[in-house]
């Protein structure tokens, strides 16, 4: 890890909290609990006041100064302002006292709720500044930065005494705070703690894990969203946007529902407009549908592996904080991969991956469309010439050759101009409960700031062909 820097001398002195002192703190805490409002969900729109506490251990002090944490928190505010399209405004208060927790760091491994509680109690005992006291009373969420790296960045090695970064809920609220994130101040280089901070804060807002749990070999939603493996994009320093479903759940996107055939649908990128398209997957199950979003490598999405239309197969009947992506055959969120390879569900061991450039859907580029138009014109001219030749002289063989050449050019033109079709023939589109695939997405434009496509929707109980006519 290299040499660590200590807390700068102009920072407040660390507050050591022993057992006897915690007993006195309990009286203050009980009073704060009595004054606390009833438990309620953290708001996902408007202002969200957050208290940030810096906490060291008796056997390991913090290695970074206050400016370091101010930068991390500032980036968190900017990130969620972007991905929520300004609908959520995090209002952080970086607390004055830097506290020292009462137990050694090894005692907090797999005990995030205890770590958060101890940090909040120590802070409440040390807070004398009116702004700190007010933040403790009014904040609706808590972030505790603890000393040292997080276990998540060295699962298969490193120091087993490093606690995990985690989201947790306090058994008893402290002030108005019920939910907390405990975050390592750093990760093992070259990894950054920012992606982990953003991910765990997503849990505080109510989002589930969207990667496969435990020892599962598949990848859930992969790198295509913050709550999946996107946490680690750019070595954890540049996590992507949340996926379309997560934004829908939080109220951060406008949903355009298309339940009948519609041509010329336009969809800007998620970095430019908060819009997604929803298409019913089953006439009998409203909880099952497709969500479409336009992703481009810009803004927070700069490190994505590719650009284009992401088509999500959603089934909200599958739920669970840690189990939503557990079963690769039936997940809350399934990415309908444009390449049809199912790499996310196969996992690395079977030759899969966490997402690649051929997962998003996109139409042919402009040069292919132009070449297709030229091929179509040449094919039509060839057929016309063959007809004229046949009218003048019944030489069958040359005429047939001209007809074949013209037909081939027309076929090439069709392939070049029309591009891929997502429909009944596409892996991952079939409704989980059986029944026909009722939606086809075709005639896609190239990936770009605004994509255009057609949506064909069959009446209930009927299906549509998966290939372009």
Regions found by a protein language model. Name each.
Residues 370-391:
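Selective detector of the "anchor" transmembrane alpha-helix that sits immediately C-terminal
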Residues 270-366, 411-466:
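Extracellular low-complexity, Gly/Ser/Thr-rich intrinsically disordered linkers
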Residues 86-87, 136, 140-304, 315-319:
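Extracellular hydrolytic enzyme modules, especially secreted metalloproteases
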Residues 129-142, 469:
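Acidic, glycine-anchored loop motifs typical of Ca2+
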């Amino acid at each position: 890890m290299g040499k660590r820097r200590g807390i700068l001398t102009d920072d407040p002195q660390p507050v050591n909290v022993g057992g006897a002192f915690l007993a006195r703190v309990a009286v203050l805490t009980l009073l704060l609990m009595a004054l606390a409002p009833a438990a309620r969900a953290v708001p996902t729109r408007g202002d969200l006041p957050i208290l940030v506490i810096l906490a060291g251990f008796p056997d390991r002090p913090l290695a970074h100064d206050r400016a370091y944490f101010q930068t991390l928190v500032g980036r968190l505010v900017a990130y969620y302002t972007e991905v929520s399209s300004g609908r959520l405004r995090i209002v952080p208060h970086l607390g004055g006292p830097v506290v020292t927790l009462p137990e050694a760091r090894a005692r907090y491994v797999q005990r995030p709720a205890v770590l958060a509680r101890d940090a909040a109690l120590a802070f409440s005992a040390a807070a004398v500044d009116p702004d700190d006291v007010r933040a403790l009373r009014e904040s609706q969420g808590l972030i505790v930065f603890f000393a040292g790296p997080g276990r998540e960045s060295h699962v298969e090695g490193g120091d087993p005494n490093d606690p995990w970064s985690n989201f947790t809920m306090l058994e008893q609220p402290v002030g108005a705070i019920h939910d907390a994130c405990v975050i390592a101040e750093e990760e093992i280089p070259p990894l950054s703690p920012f992606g982990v901070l953003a991910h765990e804060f997503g849990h505080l807002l109510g989002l589930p894990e969207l990667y496969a749990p435990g020892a599962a070999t598949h990848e859930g939603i992969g790198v295509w969203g913050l709550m999946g493996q996107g946490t680690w994009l750019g070595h954890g320093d540049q996590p992507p946007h949340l996926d379309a479903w997560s934004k829908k759940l939080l109220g951060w996107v406008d949903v355009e529902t298309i339940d009948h055939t519609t041509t010329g649908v336009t969809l800007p990128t998620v970095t430019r407009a908060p819009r997604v398209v929803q298409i019913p997957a089953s006439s009998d199950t409203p909880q099952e549908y497709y969500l479409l979003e336009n992703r481009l490598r810009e803004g927070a999405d700069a490190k994505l592996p590719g650009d284009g239309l992401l088509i999500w197969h959603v089934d909200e009947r599958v739920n669970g904080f840690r189990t939503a992506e557990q079963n690769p055959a039936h997940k809350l969120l399934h990415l309908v991969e444009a390449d049809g390879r199912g790499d996310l569900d196969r996992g690395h061991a079977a030759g899969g991956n966490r997402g690649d450039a051929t997962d998003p859907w996109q139409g042919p580029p402009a040069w292919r469309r132009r070449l297709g138009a030229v091929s179509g014109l040449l094919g039509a001219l060839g057929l016309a010439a063959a007809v004229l030749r046949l009218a003048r002289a019944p030489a069958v063989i040359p005429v047939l050759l001209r007809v074949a050449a013209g037909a081939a050019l027309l076929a090439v033109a069709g392939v070049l101009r029309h591009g891929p079709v997502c429909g009944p023939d596409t892996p991952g589109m079939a409704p989980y409960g059986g029944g026909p695939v009722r939606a086809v997405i075709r005639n896609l434009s190239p990936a770009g700031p605004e994509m255009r496509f057609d949506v064909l929707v069959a009446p209930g109980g009927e299906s549509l062909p998966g290939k372009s006519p």
